[in-house]
Regions:
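N-terminal Rossmann-like FAD-binding beta1-loop-alpha1 element of flavoenzymes
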Residues: 2-47
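N-terminal FAD cofactor-binding segment of flavoenzymes
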Residues: 20, 24, 39-120
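Predominantly flavin-linked oxidoreductase catalytic cores and closely associated redox partners
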Residues: 20-23, 40-42, 147-149, 153-154, ...
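Ferredoxin-type iron-sulfur electron-transfer modules and their immediate structural context
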Residues: 82-85, 93-96, 122-123, 410-560, ...
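Helix-loop-beta segment of a Rossmann-like dinucleotide-binding subdomain
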Residues: 121-153, 157, 292-294
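Short FAD-binding loop at a beta-strand-to-alpha-helix junction that anchors the flavin cofactor
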Residues: 283-285, 344-363
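Flavin (FAD/FMN) cofactor-binding core of flavoprotein oxidoreductases
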Residues: 319-341
Length: 608
């Protein structure tokens, strides 16, 4: 099959690209403005393949300054987008530890004692202290609270309604077609295969779609982006060592909650100092609330779902949500290297946009608006190339797209933020000092630190729990958990002092039950497993198995002899397993022992 332009992935970046491009393909009278080189006489042929089973499935809620979005939609009315609201108020809370179980550094414990002693003066309430101001670099005043799933569906409807673009959900892309040092299209995944990928009944080989330009927007864990990194390399000094899992609940707020739509709450300090929280209020008494668990949180038993429940039970959060109902939930890997994670942005026949192109601002904690704007800039460059009847060569794309990006606010702000997170390699306090220094000096000062691949910094369970749980107890918990086919984090956390979660079946539900809520997690038959354990014996002898602990959907679990096993029916496609591994790949010191391929299924909710 032939096309002119093929896009991989439909997220904010593709949304910006296709919105801008589609507006220029036809004239106002409906006649063709840009003719297709591959199908003369027809308008430009543009296809977009999305892995998830529908548009907007499996992405997240967000607060954004909406700088780029408002350029694309100058008359934007948030009320036309489900779950959207203007930012009405914003505050930053430092959460004290109400249960005494978090692993806080000594200086933070001293500070906590002082804060409690001066609670009346500092306005401490519900074991939380509101900071007197939100740092300017985090301030989202004038922005929007969005459900990106709902926003993507809204954008997709407009793009497809133009009649100039085809978007195909439930269409994972297996690989880019690389020929003669360039990309000439994509190949979709095989269907009708066993979990091992072998042909079965109704086998259908993946279709080749050839195009003059392939736009890669498959996110930070996308297999096509990683394929191009391997094929063409990344700029010297660039890396993708810093990651986080963002996990959130979508909650129906109780009648007692008086938070107005557009309220934004940021938190730090609990359940562990390294974990940051967010609380965004949508219209109609709905809220998105969740946490970010970073790769520099050196716990081999880190589990976002369990920590999210403990965070929600903090008195400062619980008072707003008690009596509410969990509607749905979701999780996503976030590329936290920012501009230093930027790959090669363009080559012969291809261009990279979005989070996987290093657009996330790691100082302002924002990525949606930046991703959208990279898509807009590529579309503007593509239209320039088409107008001049030039081919999509690396040279032409560099001139029309990359140079445009280098002059943009995305680039300028990204350079300011580039070193903002380095201090976290030294600990939470140096990290916070470094972020403040970077923000206040516009990038002139920062706390030095050298990010390392996650597998090089994760300690063993025995090292992490030294002084709190004996090695003998850890071994007992490990064996008992393996025998039951479950992860160890729940037993380890309770043994370390964390209280059991008081499940109520409404707001506090078990991880297993959450898989059935809202957009039920499911996977269609006839596709191969997309998680592969490259060296099973090494996985079997691994003492920590952080891939099991961190799995957002319990899709990775202890199998035979404790070896990690994978259940595609539970996978939410967050990609956490790609960077949560305790052992280095013998063939690539930057990688772990897990490969994450193109796959179907996952979350079935456009709220997440």
């Amino acid at each position: 099959m032939d096309a002119d332009i093929v896009c991989v992935g439909f997220g904010p970046a593709s949304g910006g690209f296709l919105t801008t491009l589609s507006r220029a393909i036809l004239n106002e009278d409906g006649s063709t403005a840009i003719e297709s080189p591959s199908a003369p006489g027809l308008p430009l042929q543009v296809l977009c393949y999305e892995r998830a089973d529908d548009l907007g499935f499996g992405v997240s809620g967000v607060v954004t300054r909406a700088r780029g979005l408002r350029v694309s939609f100058p008359d934007l009315d948030p009320s036309q987008i489900p779950m959207a609201a203007p930012v009405a108020g914003e505050k930053f809370l430092y959460l004290l530890d109400p249960v005494g179980a978090s692993c806080r550094p000594a200086l933070m414990r001293v500070a906590d004692t002082a804060i409690r002693a001066m609670g009346g003066i500092l306005g401490v309430k519900d074991d939380a202290m509101e900071l007197p101001w939100t740092p300017e670099f985090l301030d989202k005043h004038g922005g929007l609270v969005l459900s990106i799933g709902q926003f993507n569906q809204w954008v997709g409807q407009q793009v497809m309604g133009s009649g100039t673009v085809q978007i195909w959900p439930a269409s994972p892309v297996e690989e880019a077609l690389v020929e003669n040092g360039g990309v000439v299209g994509v190949r979709l995944v095989d269907q009708g295969v066993t979990k091992e990928g072998k042909p079965a009944d109704e086998f259908t080989p993946g279709m080749d779609v050839r195009a003059a330009l392939t736009v890669v927007a498959d996110g930070p864990v996308g297999p096509i982006g990683r394929q191009l990194d391997k094929a063409f390399g990344v700029p010297e000094g660039h890396h993708t060592h810093d990651w986080a899992v963002g996990m959130k609940f979508v909650v129906d707020l109780p009648e007692s909650c008086d938070l107005e739509p557009g309220t934004v709450i940021h938190t730090l300090g609990y359940p562990e100092p390294e974990i940051f929280g967010f609380f965004y209020v949508h219209p109609n008494r709905v809220a998105s609330l969740g946490i970010f668990v970073p790769s520099w949180f050196d716990s081999p038993a880190r589990n976002a779902y369990k920590y999210l429940q403990h965070w929600m039970l903090h008195p400062a959060i619980w008072r707003h949500v008690k009596g509410g109902r969990l509607r749905s939930w979701g999780a996503k890997s976030l590329q936290e290297s920012g501009r230093r994670g930027e790959p090669r942005l363009a080559g012969n026949g291809f261009a990279r946009i979005g989070e996987g192109s290093g657009s996330t601002n790691v100082l302002t904690n924002s990525g949606v608006d930046e991703a959208w704007t990279t898509g807009v800039m590529l579309a503007e460059g593509v239209l320039e190339i088409l107008k001049n009847k030039q081919p999509f060569t690396a040279e032409n794309l560099e001139a029309a797209y990359v140079s445009r990006r280098r002059k943009s606010w995305v680039e300028k702000d990204g350079r300011v933020a580039e070193r903002a997170r380095d201090g976290f390699q030294r600990g939470i306090i140096p990290g916070l000092i470094g972020m403040m220094a970077t923000g206040l000096t516009k990038g002139l000062l920062s706390m030095p630190g050298k990010p390392a691949p996650p597998h090089q910094r994760v300690p063993s369970l025995e090292e992490y729990y030294r002084g709190r749980i004996t090695p003998e107890e850890i071994q007992t918990i490990r064996k008992e958990s393996e025998a039951k086919g479950i992860s160890t984090h729940a037993a380890l956390m309770e043994r370390a002092g964390w209280p059991a979660i008081p499940f109520d079946g409404e707001l506090l539900v078990s991880h297993q039950d959450a898989l059935l809520l809202g957009g039920k997690v499911q996977a269609p038959a006839g596709y191969a497993d997309h998680v592969e354990f490259l060296y099973p014996h090494d996985c079997e002898t691994c003492g920590s198995k952080i891939c099991i602990e961190m799995c957002s959907g319990q899709a990775i679990f202890p199998g035979e002899n404790g070896r990690p096993a994978f259940d595609r029916e539970k996978c939410v496609y967050c990609g956490a397993c790609l960077w949560n591994c305790c052992k280095g790949n013998p063939k690539d010191s930057e990688k772990g022992l897990i490969e994450f391929h193109a796959g179907a299924g996952g979350l079935h909710s456009a709220e997440n």
